[in-house]
Amino acid sequence: MINFLALKSSILGDYSSSSKLIDELLAKYTPQQAIITEHDLAEQPLPVLDGEIAMAMRSPEQLNDKQRDALALSDKLISELVASDLLVIAAPMYNFMIPTQLKNWIDLVARAGKTFSYTEQGPQGLISGTRAIIVTTRGGMHKEQGTDQQVPYLKTVLNFMGISDIEVVYAESLAMGPETAELNLEQARKQLSVFTNDISTLNSQS
């Protein structure tokens, strides 16, 4: 059995290509095959990291209600991440970057002493055994170009927390006509299926 943590972050609801790819993937797994934890970060947005929450993460001794709730939520999200075998992130590109909704999740799980630590040798990720797949959808073509601020950032922050086994599924040119869009979405479906099948096989053998 594989433990999935799936994150959606599109603001487009039922019209979202990235969310549909995740839905199609998860629908292939029965309760006997996978434990699935799923968050729609746009439909149920997380709190934005602000000064109060940041101070609570540094000095949790005296907290107000807002800080206490934020830390409890952060602990819960981190527990889900640590327990996962596979993290699947659906990340549509907005203005060359990830959605704000996804950034809010990152800000709550990237915590010193919880998912990374500072050592004499430099930062060290504390998460082990979690693999990640980034599913990115774009209207144009940005793969391996300077306009892609999205994938490099996600890889950096995941590596920082100790998640280094990362695959990326690209669905690009989705605004360049329906035929092109469907062709690229179908390629993304196949690639996503291959990656998850490989990871499921490795997990069952471990």
From Swiss-Prot:
<dbReference type="GO" id="GO:0010181">
    <property type="term" value="F:FMN binding"/>
</dbReference>
<dbReference type="Pfam" id="PF02525">
    <property type="entry name" value="Flavodoxin_2"/>
</dbReference>
<dbReference type="GO" id="GO:0016652">
    <property type="term" value="F:oxidoreductase activity, acting on NAD(P)H as acceptor"/>
</dbReference>
<comment type="similarity">
    <text>Belongs to the azoreductase type 1 family.</text>
</comment>
<dbReference type="GO" id="GO:0009055">
    <property type="term" value="F:electron transfer activity"/>
</dbReference>
<dbReference type="InterPro" id="IPR003680">
    <property type="entry name" value="Flavodoxin_fold"/>
</dbReference>
<feature type="binding site">
    <location>
        <begin position="16"/>
        <end position="18"/>
    </location>
    <ligand>
        <name>FMN</name>
    </ligand>
</feature>
<keyword id="KW-0285">Flavoprotein</keyword>
<dbReference type="GO" id="GO:0016655">
    <property type="term" value="F:oxidoreductase activity, acting on NAD(P)H, quinone or similar compound as acceptor"/>
</dbReference>
<comment type="function">
    <text>Quinone reductase that provides resistance to thiol-specific stress caused by electrophilic quinones.</text>
</comment>
<keyword id="KW-0520">NAD</keyword>
<dbReference type="InterPro" id="IPR029039">
    <property type="entry name" value="Flavoprotein-like_sf"/>
</dbReference>
<protein>
    <recommendedName>
        <fullName>FMN-dependent NADH:quinone oxidoreductase</fullName>
        <ecNumber>1.6.5.-</ecNumber>
        <ecNumber>1.7.1.17</ecNumber>
    </recommendedName>
</protein>
<comment type="function">
    <text>Also exhibits azoreductase activity. Catalyzes the reductive cleavage of the azo bond in aromatic azo compounds to the corresponding amines.</text>
</comment>
<dbReference type="InterPro" id="IPR023048">
    <property type="entry name" value="NADH:quinone_OxRdtase_FMN_depd"/>
</dbReference>
<feature type="binding site">
    <location>
        <position position="10"/>
    </location>
    <ligand>
        <name>FMN</name>
    </ligand>
</feature>
<comment type="subunit">
    <text>Homodimer.</text>
</comment>
<keyword id="KW-0560">Oxidoreductase</keyword>
<dbReference type="InterPro" id="IPR050104">
    <property type="entry name" value="FMN-dep_NADH:Q_OxRdtase_AzoR1"/>
</dbReference>
<feature type="binding site">
    <location>
        <begin position="137"/>
        <end position="140"/>
    </location>
    <ligand>
        <name>FMN</name>
    </ligand>
</feature>
<feature type="binding site">
    <location>
        <begin position="93"/>
        <end position="96"/>
    </location>
    <ligand>
        <name>FMN</name>
    </ligand>
</feature>
<keyword id="KW-0288">FMN</keyword>
